[in-house]
Structure formats: C-alpha cells, structure tokens
C-alpha cells in the first residue's frame, strides 16, 4: 500500500461526500480534503483535471493506497475491506445484508432523484416540490423498514454504513423543508447519530470549503 495521506475530493454540502467523511472519521483515518465546488464557475467537477479522476464528474473521489475510488458506497466497502476496525458492516451475514439494503435504498433510491444534476433538469420553480416528493416517497419506505431493524441506530445498536448514509439524507430532507413528523424512527436515529463526534467533525458546517455564513 502507498504511504501518505489519503486525499478526498469533496464538496461541503454533498451528501455523498459527507458519507465518506463520516466513514473516514469513524475509522480514524487521517486525510486531506481538496474542495470541489459543484456550483462555482459552472461547477469545478467539469474541469478537465477533475474528469481525469472521475469521468462521471461527481464527488466524492478518494485517492488512497495508490488508487482512486469514486462512488461513496464503493469507497466505504474498500475502507471496510482494508481497514475493518471499527466495522461499518456487521459480521452476521443477515445483518450485513440489511445494512447494505438500507444503504442502497438511500444511495440509489432517494439521493440520486434529488441531486444537483436532476434538480437542474426539473427547473428552478419546481425544484423544492420535486425534492420533497421523491424524499417523502423514499422516507415512507425507509421508516417502515427501520421500525423492524432499528435499535439505537439503523440496524441494532452499532453504527453501520446504513447510519452513515442516513444522516446526510436527513440533512437533505431538512434543506428541502420535508415534514419529518411522519418519520419518528428516522428522526430519533438521526438525533442519536448527530450526538456522535464522527458525525459532528464531518458535518457540512465544519468543512474547509464551508462558506463563513454557514459555519458553526
């Protein structure tokens, strides 16, 4: 494996980037951030330099161990395989499948439908309504699932990849003014997780590229 700090290409508000920041913090991995502003200058993800890292023109991208990995779940799977302690995935195969199911529900079934590229397509005047619709649809399903899987967190009482995906998506829901009162399980788990240091240090309000007016 290559020596030197991993480098994370991240945007402070990107929920996918936040997932990876949480995972890196959880595993105690020291890393450097290279901010990629998805809005400034038409989007820095479209530069030729960044496209050599990720032809999909998306964040996050992680340089680690001599390779570059994109897609947040793939990054977390790699971290789990190479640095397994503390765990993001339970040892029990059934619990592990449930964690992956919840993670994929959020990462494939909710977030992509309300990401920046989709919102641009629906038009400025329709963005809030569209985001609320798709997040609500996903949360209706997620709440039912979590009612049967949750302990203190999404799957039992240990933080997992599912939790790493949940918190950034709840932040998206809040940003789009989704009514969270129908989702008490989601809301309770989110509150418990936000009390943990790894979720705080990785928070969008505490990143190098966070605008001054949004910092806490």
UniProtKB/Swiss-Prot annotation:
Main location: cytoplasm
Span of domain GST C-terminal: 92-212
GO cellular component: mitochondrion
Modified sites of kind Phosphoserine: 137, 181
Name of a matching Pfam family: GST_N
Modified residues (N-acetylmethionine): 1
Cited Gene3D superfamilies: 1.20.1050.10, Glutaredoxin
InterPro entries: Glutathione-S-Trfase_C-like, Glutathione-S-Trfase_C_sf, Glutathione_S-Trfase, Glutathione_S-Trfase_N, GST_C, GST_Zeta, GST_Zeta_C, GST_Zeta_N
Cellular localization per UniProt: Cytoplasm
Keyword Transferase tagged: yes
Subunit structure: Homodimer.
The family this protein is said to belong to: Belongs to the GST superfamily. Zeta family.
Name used for this protein in its record: Maleylacetoacetate isomerase
